[in-house]
Amino acid sequence: MRVRIAVIGKLDGFIKEGIKHYEKFLRRFCKPEVLEIKRVHRGSIEEIVRKETEDLTNRILPGSFVMVMDKRGEEVSSEEFADFLKDLEMKGKDITILIGGPYGLNEEIFAKAHRVFSLSKMTFTHGMTVLIVLEQIFRAFKIIHGENYHY
């Protein structure tokens, strides 16, 4: 199972270190990949959002299950997320997770998404969102495989 996370913006060094940390642990469960998509700096906010959404859409793995991380999404427990991931794994589905830029995503992407999740009612930087998503994927696989996941 391939898990691609595509995020708008350049990630800080400490975030990249965290990504390496989780990628190392995740490799026994899946093939993780984080793609940094260059931010758009020119144009109106609407034009920026449209172009960034288009750039994210172009990074969707063919035939994959598309998840969008957005504050309007559904909040689930780690156990519920593990059940969801297990179902996708059993179906042999790859996953593409999309994380928008500071202005968010346009509505087109929500029509392409199979599921929209929110991590919290709080707001996180895009880099922190990537780390939290990777941690939750790792936690989900530990739950799926009956391994201890409390550290």
From Swiss-Prot:
Record gene name: rlmH
Coiled coil: none
Subcellular location field: Cytoplasm
Reaction catalysed by this enzyme: pseudouridine(1915) in 23S rRNA + S-adenosyl-L-methionine = N(3)-methylpseudouridine(1915) in 23S rRNA + S-adenosyl-L-homocysteine + H(+)
Protein name: Ribosomal RNA large subunit methyltransferase H
Protein task: Specifically methylates the pseudouridine at position 1915 (m3Psi1915) in 23S rRNA.
Species: Thermotoga maritima (strain ATCC 43589 / DSM 3109 / JCM 10099 / NBRC 100826 / MSB8)
Keywords noted in UniProt: Cytoplasm, Methyltransferase, rRNA processing, S-adenosyl-L-methionine, Transferase
Family statement drawn from the similarity comment of this UniProt entry: Belongs to the RNA methyltransferase RlmH family.
CC annotations in GO: cytoplasm
A Pfam family annotated for this UniProt entry: SPOUT_MTase
Entry EC number(s): 2.1.1.177
The keyword Heme is assigned to this record: no
Annotated GO MF terms: rRNA (pseudouridine-N3-)-methyltransferase activity
